[in-house]
A protein has these predicted regions:
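Hydrophobic core of transmembrane alpha-helices in multi-pass small-molecule transporters
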Residues: 67-87
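C-terminal ends and interior cores of transmembrane alpha-helices
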Residues: 47-67
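Short amphipathic helix-loop junctions that connect adjacent transmembrane helices
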Residues: 1-11, 132
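Multi-pass alpha-helical transporter architecture, strongest
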Residues: 146-171
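A membrane-interface helix-boundary motif in multi-pass transporters
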Residues: 129-153
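Helix-to-loop junctions at the C-terminal end of transmembrane segments
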Residues: 24-39, 131-132
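A late C-terminal transmembrane helix in Major Facilitator Superfamily
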Residues: 103-134
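Intracellular juxtamembrane helix-capping segments at the cytosolic ends
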Residues: 87-101
């Protein structure tokens, strides 16, 4: 938003977009995710998040468009990120019982939430300054977004490996 010459007032429409997506699509996507299965949806959710960062990287070398179109990169980011999250959250909760016994199920759900929060915090602390390099339109402005895309992409690959045993029924 800042790169596009926007301000805090431009956050409102983006929050409305995210809220609208959740209101309209959270339940249908959760049903879809459960029908397809967490084993397949977890990698897809992480890939959507990776693509959200890639979408901003694609716009980074160009001067921002005029008018409301200047928010297009942010709208793409919010849409893809939110959709990825709407797939990941129910799928992630669905796989927790695979790793936990009945007695420790609550602790495992708490650990899942804590791990997500810690990942966001660590990402902001370690990579937040990197985004300052993305403020001026240039080819170099793509790199911070590409770096950020690597982490959910690696998570998607990890989910393929981690979830492989879940494709077979437990004995």
């Amino acid at each position: 938003i800042q790169r596009a010459g926007g301000s805090e007032k431009d956050l409102g429409p983006l929050f409305m977009l995210a809220s609208g997506l959740v209101i309209l699509f959270q339940l249908p996507l959760a049903r879809f995710a459960r029908r397809v299965g967490a084993v397949r949806i977890l990698p897809v959710g992480f890939l959507l998040i990776a693509v959200s960062f890639l979408s901003v990287a694609l716009f980074a070398p160009s001067e921002p468009a005029a008018g409301w179109l200047r928010l297009l990169p942010a709208a793409c980011f919010v849409t893809l990120l939110t959709t990825g999250q709407m797939l990941l959250v129910p799928a992630g909760k669905d796989v927790v019982p695979w790793f936990a016994s009945e007695a420790t199920l609550g602790a495992h759900y708490g650990a899942l939430a804590t791990a997500g929060g810690c990942a966001v915090l660590a990402g902001n602390l370690l990579l937040g300054d990197l985004l300052d390099r993305a403020l001026t339109p240039s080819v170099g402005a793509m790199y911070p977004w590409l770096v950020l895309a690597v982490f959910p992409f690696c998570s998607a690959l990890a989910m393929v490996v981690i979830c492989r045993p879940m494709r077979r029924p437990r004995a």
